[in-house]
């Protein structure tokens, strides 16, 4: 692939290095009204937008999450730190999972660790997950680079030019998409298992 594509990839990988996320210490430990929640999420996750007009979180989204049992209802119209942490998880999950799947994934958290006074707080879970994700970033970048280099070895029988560039880029996109597809399938199988176990536990009650 040509220099422009290589430069684009390097630029993207540099962005990954500085990828912002909601740091555990930045989540306010006070109850917020809905307007304050949407403002907080917009400020914290603005850099993750693909387009400037993209919405991070709206009032309608929050109400729908509550309606679909992803998010416990607010107390006297106020949302706690635990609500905010769940909303961060939902924000990332919704890009790859259905609402029903997100409900299944978050159900154990909302049932066991959401209430105040629980032995293991949701904030502790969030911190642990953030730690894992930061540790994975370097290996993800290495994997993407290796995939790029492998894709650059395709269609070598073609002369250098637009056709070769387009097809090598297509091969790169396909390889990345296949990786996403396989990982998404694994996630869905795990979620199906969680759902099955949950149903069996309900039947025993």
How should these model regions be labeled?
Residues 108, 112-205:
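Intrinsically disordered, low-complexity, charge-dense segments enriched in Lys/Arg
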């Amino acid at each position: 692939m040509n220099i422009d594509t290589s430069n684009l990839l390097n630029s993207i990988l540099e962005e990954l290095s500085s990828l912002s996320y909601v740091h555990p210490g930045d989540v306010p430990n006070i109850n917020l009204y809905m307007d304050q929640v949407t403002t907080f999420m917009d400020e914290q996750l603005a850099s993750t937008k693909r387009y400037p007009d993209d919405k991070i979180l709206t009032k309608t989204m929050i109400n729908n999450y509550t309606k679909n049992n992803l998010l416990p209802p607010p107390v006297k119209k106020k949302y706690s730190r635990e609500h905010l942490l769940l909303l961060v998880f939902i924000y990332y999950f919704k890009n790859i999972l259905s609402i029903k799947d997100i409900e299944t994934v978050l159900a154990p958290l909302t049932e066991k660790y959401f209430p105040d006074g629980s032995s293991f707080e949701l904030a502790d879970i969030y911190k642990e997950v953030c730690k894992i994700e930061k540790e994975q970033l370097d290996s993800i970048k290495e994997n993407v680079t290796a995939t790029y280099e492998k894709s650059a070895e395709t269609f070598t029988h073609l002369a250098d030019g637009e056709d070769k560039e387009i097809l090598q880029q297509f091969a790169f996109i396909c390889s990345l998409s296949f990786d996403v597809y396989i990982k998404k399938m694994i996630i869905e199988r795990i979620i199906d298992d969680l759902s099955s176990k949950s149903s069996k536990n309900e039947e025993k009650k």
